[in-house]
């Protein structure tokens, strides 16, 4: 599955990696997949997607998928961002 996803699906034409990453994060937020959000929020940051863009995506998703998943995702994003800031400072 991982080989297929990252070797095939993520390489298909039509979307840039940053777009795929943001879409994936939105799906994970909408479906409440907190564990996977950690990995993909890290990946999004590594691709240069800003915290502000991810926060805006979470707010947008909240209007369609509900505020409880958005609040949870906001917490997860803060945890990931803070951890990455600490990693880069050391």
Locations of regions flagged by a protein language model:
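Acidic, glycine/proline-rich low-complexity segments that act as flexible tails and inter-domain linkers
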Residues: 1-18, 46, 69-90
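Short alpha-helix boundary/capping elements
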Residues: 5, 27-34, 65-66
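Short, structured motif recognition centered on aromatic/hydrophobic residues
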Residues: 19-28, 57-58
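Extended intrinsically disordered, low-complexity coil regions enriched in Ser, Thr, Gly, Ala
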Residues: 33-55, 70-81
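Short secondary-structure capping/turn micro-motifs that flank functional sites
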Residues: 60-61, 78
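C-terminal structural segments of small proteins and small subunits
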Residues: 62-70
């Amino acid at each position: 599955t991982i080989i297929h996803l990252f070797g095939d699906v993520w390489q298909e034409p039509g979307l840039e990696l940053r777009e795929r990453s943001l879409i994936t994060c939105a799906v994970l937020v909408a479906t409440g997949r907190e564990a996977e959000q950690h990995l993909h929020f890290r990946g999004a940051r590594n691709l240069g997607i800003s915290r502000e863009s991810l926060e805006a995506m979470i707010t947008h998703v909240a209007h369609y998928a509900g505020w409880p998943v958005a609040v949870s995702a906001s917490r997860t994003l803060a945890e990931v961002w803070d951890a990455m800031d600490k990693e880069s400072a050391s």
